[in-house]
C-alpha cells in the first residue's frame, strides 16, 4: 500500500508525493496539485523498495526517478534547500505559512535522504542509471547547509525566506525528528558544517541528555516539549541512517533509545487513559497525520492523543 500511494498517487508532472489525497477528489483548499518535499523523500524510498521487489520493472522505476530529478533540478530552491511545498505543475513554491515561502532545511534533509538512497541504488548500474546518480549527486552538493546557520551560529535554522529572511526564527535543538538534518549537514562534501554545530546546536552542549522513565520505560534523551515524542521521531531520521550500533557521547545506543521510544508509544496505547475504542496491543501508533481537528502530531500523552491511529 505505501508503494501504491507514492506510485499511483503521484502528482503527474513532477512524479512527487501529493501533500494530501482526497479519495472523493474534492479539495476545498484547491491544493490537489501541491506536492511535498520531505514526504517525497519517503516516497522515493518506497518506490526503490517496489523496484527491488519487482512491483514495477527497473526501467519503469528509472523513468519515474528521472522525472522526479528533472523536476527537482528546475524547481524553486533557496541556497540549495527546497521549500516544504511546491505547485507540482510549475515547480514554484507554495507557501507553507505566511512567512514560510523559502527554504525548509528539515524537509530538504528528508528529501536528500531519499535521493541519496536512489544514488546508491544506481551508482553501479547501466549508463542511464549512472547518469541519474550523477545528477542526484549534484543536487546533494548544491545544498548550502552553512547558509542555514544564520550568520555562522553553531546551530541550524529550520527556515529562510527570500522575502522575510530569518523572521521565522526557528533554531533546531534535539531531540526530535531532525537528527538526520544535522548528520547530512556535517557530511556534506561541499558545504559541511563544523562539529560544533552538532554539539552546540543539536545537543546543546549535553542538555539533550535527560534520563527519565515514561510508561515505566527508560529513555535517555530529552524530547523537545514533551517526555516522549510522536512515533515519527523514532522513524524519520533512521530511514537512511542505521541506528544499530550508532552512539555518541549523548546517547549510548540510538537503536535502544528509538526502540524504547516506540515501546512507550505502544504502552501508552495499551493503557489507553482516554478509553478509545480499539486501542490495544495490536492497534497502536500515535504519529503525525490528519485528525478530526485537521493535521496533528499525535503523541503518547493525554493532551496530544486525539484517538487517531495512523495507518
Please provide the spans of the model-predicted regions.
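Ser/Thr/Asn(+Pro)-rich, low-complexity disordered segments
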Residues: 1-311
